[in-house]
């Protein structure tokens, strides 16, 4: 559905549209397995189809994925996913791409999603419990755009703290399931407040230069 793919093909370039085993199911996604799938596509392009050079073109999250893939293909270090699942990338023999093209790429999933977290939420089980001084959408919050450097630093720190609280809870839940002999059980939960990046309200935070 990306216009760049059709445009490249119409211009005479050979294009392979790669998708992972997680298409449409990001809630179950393990990025290390996506790297494995991308590696299989590159290997197939070179070994079966006979292409001498393969250039990765990553759009949005595909950009950070492409860079992650290339780094692990050249200098493999990741032996498991953060949850302890997923393939050992050091054993896969990933083939480095011959070039990378980044299209509207963000820096990473974890970085982007953390920067979107509503830092004011204090209780994951009750998102109405908030720190009013961090609530971007509270008209009574004295911290309004343009934001001060001090407020932005405090807000970003609170976002990271919230991320770590959620992560600690998730790891604890996974440990509970493993201890109960049910490591493959699914346990869904909602992360509230995921549209609260100060740059959306204050253009000076991330100006388009």
Per-segment meaning from a language model:
Residues 44-47, 52-125:
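Primarily recognizes the serine-hydrolase "nucleophile elbow" in alpha/beta-hydrolase
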Residues 18-24, 48, 86-87, 130-143:
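Short C-terminal domain-edge/linker segments immediately following a structured domain
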Residues 4, 34-41, 61, 65:
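Generic hydrophobic, aliphatic-rich segments that mediate packing or membrane embedding
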Residues 1:
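Active-site glycine-rich loops that stabilize anionic/oxyanionic intermediates
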């Amino acid at each position: 559905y990306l216009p760049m793919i059709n445009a490249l093909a119409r211009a005479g370039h050979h294009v392979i549209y790669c998708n992972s085993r997680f298409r449409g199911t990001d809630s179950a996604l393990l990025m290390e397995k996506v790297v494995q799938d991308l590696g299989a596509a590159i290997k197939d392009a070179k070994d079966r189809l006979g292409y001498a050079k393969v250039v990765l073109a990553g759009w949005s999250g595909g950009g950070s994925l492409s860079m992650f893939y290339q780094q692990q293909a050249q200098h493999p270090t990741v032996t498991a996913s953060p949850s302890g699942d997923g393939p050992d990338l050091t054993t896969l023999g990933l083939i480095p791409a011959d070039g990378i093209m980044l299209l509207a790429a963000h820096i990473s999933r974890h970085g982007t999603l953390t920067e979107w977290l509503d830092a004011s939420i204090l209780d994951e089980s009750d998102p109405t419990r908030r720190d009013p001084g961090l609530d971007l959408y509270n008209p009574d919050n004295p911290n309004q755009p343009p934001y001060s450097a001090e407020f932005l630093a405090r807000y970003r720190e609170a976002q990271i703290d919230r991320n770590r609280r959620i992560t600690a809870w998730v790891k604890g839940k996974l440990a509970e399931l493993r201890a109960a002999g049910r490591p493959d059980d699914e346990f869904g939960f909602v992360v509230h407040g995921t549209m609260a990046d100060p740059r959306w309200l204050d253009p000076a935070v991330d100006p388009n230069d």
